[in-house]
């Protein structure tokens, strides 16, 4: 049996893009800022299944179905459930994650009954700083959705974004709030500036990002997935080994919601060169 550290790979599928009416200052999917991104209504379920099959072939264990918008409604929950059922029927071995905004306990139970394994809802930043990045909904609403996920029996995936102008205390408060939820997995995102967005610059560098990974690892524990997600290529390109040594054990492969990521083959070569194994089963964690 290999003793090499295993890295868990996750792929994201933006199945409804660029239609959100909220005012989150970090998000190109908001219609308020007119960012130059691809915007479209629901993808065909057959396309979602085919993209899931490709993600699995690229080594992904996690496959996240993401929709733009504040939260779930009847139409959205039905579509995500049907997409999940189709993926589960056609592609074996994927941990299906839904990321669809605020959600009630009843909606989350419905998704679980139709094949979703985990629900992603990020706290984004500290409760204190949240009004600086969003006014159309509150931080507490996000926290309550995470509590609903726990109550539903779904695994919780919850993290945040760093580098949006927040203070060091805000970062510590965010990580403490995430830890209080005891999520099974936590994505750490690092802000990717876009000229259309109100937040123009990123106030975080490589060493600070490493410290966030170390602190998250300490607070969350060894038995949780700690994923470096958005912004990885901006801060850790060529320095991925330090990221993993700091405690990260998961990355997103392929593209993000509206920005390009590394080609999956490049990530696989990087992991092989550094001496890590791609995890082949969620049971191994």
Curated annotation (Swiss-Prot):
Leader sequence segment: none
Classification via SMART domains: BATS, Elp3
Superkingdom classification of source: Bacteria
Catalyzed reaction equations: (4R,5S)-dethiobiotin + (sulfur carrier)-SH + 2 reduced [2Fe-2S]-[ferredoxin] + 2 S-adenosyl-L-methionine = (sulfur carrier)-H + biotin + 2 5'-deoxyadenosine + 2 L-methionine + 2 oxidized [2Fe-2S]-[ferredoxin]
A family per Pfam: Radical_SAM
Chain segments annotated as transmembrane: none
Keywords, alphabetical: 2Fe-2S, 4Fe-4S, Biotin biosynthesis, Iron, Iron-sulfur, Metal-binding, S-adenosyl-L-methionine, Transferase
Protein's UniProt name: Biotin synthase
Positions that bind [2Fe-2S] cluster: 64, 99, 157
Function: Catalyzes the conversion of dethiobiotin (DTB) to biotin by the insertion of a sulfur atom into dethiobiotin via a radical-based mechanism.
Domain Radical SAM core as annotated: residue spans: 2-223
Quaternary structure note: Homodimer.
Gene3D superfamilies named among the record's database cross-references: Aldolase class I
Similarity-based family: Belongs to the radical SAM superfamily. Biotin synthase family.
UniProt cofactor note: Binds 1 [4Fe-4S] cluster. The cluster is coordinated with 3 cysteines and an exchangeable S-adenosyl-L-methionine.
PANTHER family, per database record: BIOTIN SYNTHASE (PTHR22976), BIOTIN SYNTHASE, MITOCHONDRIAL (PTHR22976:SF2)
Pathway assignment: Cofactor biosynthesis; biotin biosynthesis; biotin from 7,8-diaminononanoate: step 2/2
Cofactor(s) essential for the protein: [4Fe-4S] cluster; [2Fe-2S] cluster
One of the GO BP terms on file: biotin biosynthetic process
NCBIfam families with a match to the protein in the record: bioB (TIGR00433), PRK08508.1 (NF006308)
Gene Ontology terms, MF aspect: 2 iron, 2 sulfur cluster binding; 4 iron, 4 sulfur cluster binding; biotin synthase activity; iron ion binding
SUPFAM superfamilies: Radical SAM enzymes
EC id: 2.8.1.6
Binding site for [4Fe-4S] cluster: 20, 24, 27
InterPro entries: Aldolase_TIM, BATS_dom, Biotin_synth/BioAB, Biotin_synthase, Elp3/MiaA/NifB-like_rSAM, rSAM
